[in-house]
């Protein structure tokens, strides 16, 4: 599933081609996504795009009368096309722009979403979200406060959007490795120093992935059709049985609640 770096990479890639241009019309080939594509999107015509923003894993296209909320789901990606290339099986939505560009949404598993809202505030998919991990609000003090009485393992807690948004399976595994924290540790067992370090490395890992265009393991592509290159820098995720890049100990993989967890027994305590 695309996580924060992949969604932010998409935002940065499409923004220059959309902001200041006008949506001439939307071409919906298959509106049966996780939720049906909103009727308002079908009716778009001569509509300027004012901004392209992100909240958590949602892309937000600001229009004069409302917002398009896009979620990439498990396998979605957005590309900017310079010409109307023939659509393939999983190309479900096109926004045809006044500058000759086309924003094309591809989603093999159709778990993504294209929604419409007049106001962002209070929308059900955006309500109850925690802070952005790259914001000043997310820091060691905040993390320690939220972990202090939490009797659950730290890894699934990091992946809870009520704690912090956008840290999914890949980046939770990578951040815990960078901080030297075992993924099964109780959140309440983390010390002040460990919370400070973990907040710092989460920011560093996410920023590095954004620099590399995100992580492509299967379906994700950047807006120019290229893969994300952070996969080449993964320390533990997807490396079961391979030697730890730090100590040489084979990487361990376990599964909890259908989620794979990767870690080094020697480096993470």
Swiss-Prot record:
Its cofactor is Zn(2+). GO terms for biological process: base-excision repair. It holds the Pfam family zf-FPG_IleRS. One of its GO terms (molecular function) is damaged DNA binding. Its EC number is 3.2.2.23, 4.2.99.18. The keyword Zinc-finger applies. It catalyses: Hydrolysis of DNA containing ring-opened 7-methylguanine residues, releasing 2,6-diamino-4-hydroxy-5-(N-methyl)formamidopyrimidine; 2'-deoxyribonucleotide-(2'-deoxyribose 5'-phosphate)-2'-deoxyribonucleotide-DNA = a 3'-end 2'-deoxyribonucleotide-(2,3-dehydro-2,3-deoxyribose 5'-phosphate)-DNA + a 5'-end 5'-phospho-2'-deoxyribonucleoside-DNA + H(+). InterPro entries: DNA_glyclase/AP_lyase_DNA-bd (IPR015886), DNA_glyclase_Znf_dom_DNA_BS (IPR015887), Formamido-pyr_DNA_Glyclase (IPR020629), FPG_cat (IPR012319), MutM-like_N-ter (IPR035937), Ribosomal_uS13-like_H2TH (IPR010979), Znf_DNA_glyclase/AP_lyase (IPR000214), Znf_FPG/IleRS (IPR010663). The keyword S-adenosyl-L-methionine does not apply. Coiled coil: none annotated. The active site is at 2 (schiff-base intermediate with dna), 3 (proton donor), 57 (proton donor), 259 (proton donor). Monomer. This is Formamidopyrimidine-DNA glycosylase. It comes from Salmonella newport (strain SL254).
């Amino acid at each position: 599933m695309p996580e924060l770096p992949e969604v932010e990479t998409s935002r940065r890639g499409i923004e220059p081609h959309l902001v200041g241009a006008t949506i001439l019309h939307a071409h919906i080939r298959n509106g049966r996504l996780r939720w049906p594509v909103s009727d308002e999107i079908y009716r778009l015509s001569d509509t300027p795009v004012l901004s392209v923003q992100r909240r958590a894993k949602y892309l937000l296209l600001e229009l004069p009368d409302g917002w398009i909320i896009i979620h990439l789901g498990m396998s979605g990606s957005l590309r900017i096309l310079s010409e109307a290339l023939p659509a393939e099986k999983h190309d479900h939505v096109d926004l045809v722009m006044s500058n000759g560009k086309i924003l094309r949404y591809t989603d093999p598993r159709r778990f993504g979403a294209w929604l419409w809202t007049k106001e962002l505030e209070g929308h059900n998919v955006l309500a109850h979200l925690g802070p952005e991990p790259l914001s000043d609000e997310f820091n060691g003090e905040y993390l320690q406060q939220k972990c202090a009485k939490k009797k659950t393992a730290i890894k699934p807690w990091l992946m809870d959007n009520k704690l912090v948004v956008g840290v999914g399976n890949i980046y939770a595994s990578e951040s815990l490795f960078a901080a030297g924290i075992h993924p099964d540790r109780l959140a309440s067992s983390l010390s002040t120093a460990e919370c400070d370090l973990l907040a710092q490395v989460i920011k560093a890992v996410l920023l590095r992935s954004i620099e590399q265009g995100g992580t492509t393991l299967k379906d994700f592509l950047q807006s120019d059709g290229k893969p994300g290159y952070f996969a080449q820098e993964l320390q533990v995720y997807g490396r079961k049985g391979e030697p730890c890049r730090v100590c040489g100990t084979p990487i361990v993989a376990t599964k909890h609640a259908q989620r794979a967890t990767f870690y080094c027994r020697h480096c993470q305590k």
